[in-house]
Amino acid sequence: MPIIIDKDLPARKVLQKENIFVMTKERAETQDIRALKIAILNLMPTKQDTEAQLLRLIGNTPLQLDVHLLHMESHLSRNVTQEHLTSFYKTFRDIENEKFDGLIITGAPVETLAFEEVDYWEELKHIMEYSKTNVTSTLHICWGAQAGLYYHYGVPKYPLKEKVFGVFEHEVCEQHVKLLQGFDELFFAPHSRHTEVRENDIRGVKELTLLANSEEAGVHLVIGPEGRQVFALGHSEYSCETLKQEYERDRDKGLNIDVPKNYFKHNNPDEKPLVRWRSHGNLLFSNWLNYYVYQETPYIL
């Protein structure tokens, strides 16, 4: 089934080239189907790349999704045009009286700041509080996961001596959890962050369950009661080239950046990246949508 997006959204052409079924809102209105309402709060500066990455994954399911893109009203985005935001995005004020089946909160390059120092923290707190009563399930990614764990459960983040950067092996910590249906006991996921949350802190909160962990990268997947809140500290949505682009960006700036681990063939940045996380990335998003959104949401929101 398709994802329903604006016919002029640039990501639409990218997805169509990959044979991912997308549908315009105009066509969807002619069908007698109750599509799932999914909001994506896009905190990334590279908004169009993130749009394509997430739409690629949530579009690879049997479910019909009506996607709403959100941006922070209290933050000035410098890497995307105002025209793009005006054409394709809404703010929280635009949707605060609506209910959604699912919400995705992305990462953001602000992890070295204290949460309270982030210029849109107050607005984000309102959105996370809203999600508790107006969203069936919320998936938090990377810094978005750190922010959610901190806001909802008081779990702190800690600075790392070295950036966790690359593709890392993870072990499933809990069997027979719906979010991990079909997962291998060992699987890969990308990480790109300067801070961490710690296993002991997660296990110290009785409402939280640690689902997947990595010896090198640390905590990856955590879930709250009844799956209302899901936290992914890694970046299972990343495309093949994303880590390469981040590495080349920082290298060209003269920053002290290591080659991403377990990513390039033979660890040689002149060779092609080796994708080892795609299948589990698709499985993570499809399980979330199926078991924690579609199976749990009421027909009438």
Curated annotation (Swiss-Prot):
The record marks E111 as: Important for acyl-CoA specificity. It comes from the Bacteria. It catalyses: L-homoserine + acetyl-CoA = O-acetyl-L-homoserine + CoA. Its main location: cytoplasm. The keyword Cytoplasm applies. It holds the Pfam family HTS. GO terms for cellular component: cytoplasm. Its EC number is 2.3.1.31. Substrate binds at K163, S192, R249. The record marks S192 as: Important for substrate specificity. Pathway: Amino-acid biosynthesis; L-methionine biosynthesis via de novo pathway; O-acetyl-L-homoserine from L-homoserine: step 1/1. The keyword Acyltransferase applies. GO terms for molecular function: homoserine O-acetyltransferase activity; homoserine O-succinyltransferase activity. It is found in: Cytoplasm. GO terms for biological process: L-methionine biosynthetic process from homoserine via O-succinyl-L-homoserine and cystathionine. Transfers an acetyl group from acetyl-CoA to L-homoserine, forming acetyl-L-homoserine. HAMAP family: MetA_acyltransf. Belongs to the MetA family. This is Homoserine O-acetyltransferase. It comes from Bacillus cereus (strain B4264). The gene is metAA.
